[in-house]
Regions:
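Hydrophobic structural packing positions in well-ordered secondary structure
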Residues: 7-10, 83, 128
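Phosphate-binding/catalytic loops
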Residues: 81, 87-127
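Conserved active-site segments centered on acidic
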Residues: 1-77
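Short, surface-exposed, polar/charged, turn-prone segments marking secondary-structure boundaries
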Residues: 32-34, 61-64, 108-112, 126-128
């Protein structure tokens, strides 16, 4: 199963979701190829933010800093599931295999913690 997580810049939410999903899939014995991408990349912010790494590690889940990547049509077409953090992001990827996080687990859009304090990142990681 190929699962792709998408957020705005691939620096906060989608890398956290990737690490968390990978951890729990492995713990459950589910074979999954998990990755994450952004709709856009800011050249000044092109890797996983430190606050995101800290938030996921607080959950005792391993996560590594990664270089941000932009989602492509090929990535979407080759995935079984593409999971966006917001409806607006889903609307930017008009394919049948694209779902919002809330469509799959409920709870509404996942707000972007970018630019906020560590607590915002911790709350985001916990929700994911």
């Amino acid at each position: 199963m190929r699962v792709v997580f998408v957020c705005t810049g691939n620096t906060c939410r989608s890398p956290m979701a990737e690490a968390i999903f990978r951890f729990y899939a492995k713990e459950s014995g589910v074979k999954a190829d998990v990755s994450s991408y952004g709709l856009f990349i800011n050249p000044d912010e092109c890797e996983t933010r430190g606050q995101a790494l800290i938030a996921v590690r607080k959950l005792n889940i391993p996560i590594r800093k990664k270089k941000s990547k932009v989602i492509t049509e090929d990535v979407v077409k080759n995935a079984d599931y593409v999971v966006t953090m917001t409806k607006k992001q889903k609307d930017a990827l008009p394919y049948d295999n694209v779902f919002t996080f809330s469509e799959l687990v409920g709870g509404g859009d996942i707000p972007d913690p970018y630019g906020l304090d560590q607590n915002a990142y911790d709350v985001t990681a916990f929700r994911l």
